[in-house]
C-alpha cells in the first residue's frame, strides 16, 4: 500500500553541480546547485534553478553564461562548503584551494580539479516562483582523460556526488546495471 505525502522535492537524487560565474569585477565565483538537469538533446541543453538571492543569480543575469563543474566524491567537503558560503562574503575558490580556469568558450570559470565540465551560454530565463531557471546551451564539454572510457564520460570513474532532498544526504553512484534500450520484448 502506498502512503500519500505532501508535495515536495523528494524526487530521485540529483547530481551536485558546481555552477561557475564571474561577478561585475571579473572575480570567479562558484556555488552548488541541486536543482538542475538535462532539458534538451539538440541543441544539447541543461538548466540550473537558482534563488534570486544568490550571488550567482545576478552574475548569470549579467554575463549570460555559466559553467557546471561536476565534482568527484573526493571533493565532497569542498562541494559542501561551496554550497554554504556566499561569494558576497568570501572567495570560496581560495578558501577551498580549488583552481578557477577561464572558459575559452563562455564568459564563466570552471573548477580545474573537477573531472567533468559543461560550458553553457544562457538561452532562456524563466522565473518559476522562488527560483529562476537558467537554460544553458552546452557549447563545450571538458573532461579529464582519466574520467573517460572510449571517449565518453564514465560514471564509475567520475564518482559524482548525488544529493537527495528526501533524506537531506549526499550519496554515491552504485554499480552499472545493464546496457540501456535492450529489452525488445515485454519482460516475463
Which functions belong to the PLM regions below?
Residues 1-188:
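Basic, polyanion-binding surface patches
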Amino acid at each position: 500500500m502506498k502512503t500519500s505525502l505532501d508535495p515536495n522535492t523528494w524526487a530521485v537524487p540529483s547530481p551536485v553541480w558546481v555552477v561557475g560565474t564571474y561577478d561585475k569585477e571579473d572575480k570567479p565565483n562558484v556555488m552548488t546547485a541541486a536543482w538542475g538537469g538535462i532539458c534538451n538533446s539538440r541543441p544539447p541543453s541543461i538548466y540550473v534553478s537558482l534563488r534570486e538571492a544568490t550571488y550567482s543569480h545576478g552574475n548569470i543575469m549579467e554575463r549570460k553564461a555559466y559553467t557546471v563543474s561536476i565534482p568527484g566524491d573526493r571533493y565532497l567537503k569542498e562541494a559542501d562548503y561551496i554550497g554554504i558560503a556566499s561569494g558576497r562574503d568570501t572567495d570560496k575558490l581560495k578558501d577551498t584551494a580549488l583552481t578557477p580556469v577561464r572558459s575559452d568558450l563562455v564568459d564563466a570559470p570552471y573548477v580545474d580539479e573537477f573531472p567533468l565540465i559543461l560550458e553553457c551560454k544562457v538561452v532562456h530565463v524563466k522565473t518559476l516562483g522562488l527560483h529562476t531557471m537558467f537554460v544553458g546551451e552546452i557549447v563545450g564539454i571538458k573532461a579529464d582523460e582519466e574520467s573517460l572510457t572510449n571517449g565518453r564520460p564514465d560514471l564509475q570513474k567520475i564518482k559524482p556526488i548525488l544529493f537527495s532532498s528526501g533524506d537531506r544526504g549526499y550519496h554515491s553512484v552504485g554499480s552499472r546495471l545493464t546496457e540501456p534500450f535492450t529489452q525488445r520484448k515485454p519482460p516475463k
